[in-house]
Curated annotation (Swiss-Prot):
Coiled coil (residue ranges): none
A single cellular component GO annotation: cytosolic large ribosomal subunit
Pfam families hit by this protein: Ribosomal_L18p
Protein name as annotated: Large ribosomal subunit protein uL18
Similarity comment: Belongs to the universal ribosomal protein uL18 family.
HAMAP family from the UniProt entry: Ribosomal_uL18_B
Its job: This is one of the proteins that bind and probably mediate the attachment of the 5S RNA into the large ribosomal subunit, where it forms part of the central protuberance.
Assembly information from the UniProt record: Part of the 50S ribosomal subunit; part of the 5S rRNA/L5/L18/L25 subcomplex. Contacts the 5S and 23S rRNAs.
């Protein structure tokens, strides 16, 4: 029987492969979720550079949040990331859930980013 970390890695690589096939050179919004914090970044895979990032450990958000690992915090990260991306001139991205299920904090981040102006 495979461990949960092995299954997670399989899901992550399968997701990344599909994104590579379907992205057509668009930027990638990558999500990382830990038990305490939420991180998101927009990556240009052609150049291998992170263009915009936001997380619950940013100084802008740290004072406003009571917890860094709940849905409200994830929504704030999505909103901040979308604002920074729009200021830098990026609006079209491909969502990379990174092997996590599209539920809970990951979904809250994605919905907030969409509402703030990112399209994916």
């Amino acid at each position: 029987m495979k461990s949960s970390s092995e299954l997670f890695e399989r899901r992550r690589s399968r997701n990344r492969y599909q994104i590579r096939l379907k992205s057509a050179g668009r930027l990638r919004l990558s999500v990382f979720r830990s038990n305490k914090h939420m991180y998101a970044q927009i990556i240009d895979d052609a150049e291998g550079r992170t263009l915009v990032s936001a997380s619950t450990v940013d100084k802008e958000l740290r004072g406003n949040l009571t917890k860094g690992g709940d849905k409200a915090a994830a929504a704030e990260v999505g909103k901040l990331l979308a604002e920074r991306a729009k200021a830098a001139g990026y609006t079209e991205v491909v969502f990379d859930r990174g092997g996590y299920k599209y539920h809970g904090r990951v979904q809250a981040l994605a919905d907030a980013a969409r509402e703030a102006g990112l399209s994916f």
